[in-house]
Regions:
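Hydrophobic transmembrane alpha-helices and their helix-loop junctions in integral membrane proteins
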Residues: 1-241
């Protein structure tokens, strides 16, 4: 019971499922100055660190606990990333992968090996960098165009080349494409899951889920970068600088 209550508090701080529902609304409604720094907020850092301390210092973290925490991470990353694909608000498109990337951190910590824990914490640091960049680009687009609606955007790469370049680099990073930083931390988590899978095949399923989620992350990143910056430029955006 004590472990369950502490786990709930850590998930609420970090934004893991099922305590993630506040994140998309915050990202969609808050000013860019808030959303851009949200991935690196102290609360999220503390949530992940708290989870690490709970799992590996405060309790006797056996195989059952490990399976539960890693499973929560796998479900979180898959559900949140799939949900991002159906969004039309560019900030909500970016908000759900915030939750999904937390799933990778939770899974790494849940696996419990030194490589898994290091991968989860390293992914937290990487997440702060590329997600802040993505939110900054969405804020720049909203400021210049006056809209967050993906259906009213497009073709902005020529008008905002620096913003497009930053969005592209961050999109490749969050998708785990080598040689960008997201690939390194995700690879560490994959390897940790495969290492433990020799003792429990369920972790092989978790590794497959993580890899599939990365492909869905690429799909949502393409949707954001392509929908905003590529394609034809709407007439009402021809004066954008």
């Amino acid at each position: 019971l004590i472990f369950s209550l502490m786990l709930i508090s850590a998930l609420a701080k970090a934004g893991g499922m099922p305590l993630h529902t506040w994140i998309p609304d915050l990202a969609a409604e808050a000013p860019t100055s808030v959303t851009s720094y949200f991935p690196a907020a102290a609360d999220k850092f503390l949530g992940i660190f708290k989870l690490t301390i709970i799992c590996h210092i405060l309790v006797s973290f056996g195989p059952t606990y490990s399976l539960v925490v890693a499973g929560i991470g796998a479900v979180t990353m898959l559900f949140a990333t799939l949900t991002a694909i159906i969004q039309r608000d560019i900030k909500r498109i970016l908000a759900f992968p915030v939750i999904g990337q937390v799933g990778y951190m939770i899974m790494g910590i849940g696996i419990g090996t030194p490589l898994g824990i290091a991968g989860g914490l390293f992914h937290m640091v990487n997440h702060c960098m590329y997600k802040m960049c993505l939110f900054q680009t969405s804020g720049a687009v909203q400021m210049r165009t006056g809209t967050k609606d993906l259906d009213r955007l497009g073709g902005l790469a020529k008008k905002m080349p620096v913003t497009f370049t930053c969005a592209l680099i961050a999109a490749l990073s969050i998708s785990g494409i080598p040689p960008f930083n997201g690939f390194v931390s995700k690879w560490m988590i994959y390897q940790a899951a495969l290492e433990v899978a020799t003792r429990n095949p369920v972790y092989l399923v978790f590794a497959v889920v993580a890899a599939i989620t990365s492909s869905f992350t690429l799909a949502h990143a393409i949707k954001y970068a392509g929908g905003v910056f590529l394609g034809s430029l709407p007439k009402e955006l021809e004066k954008v600088k």
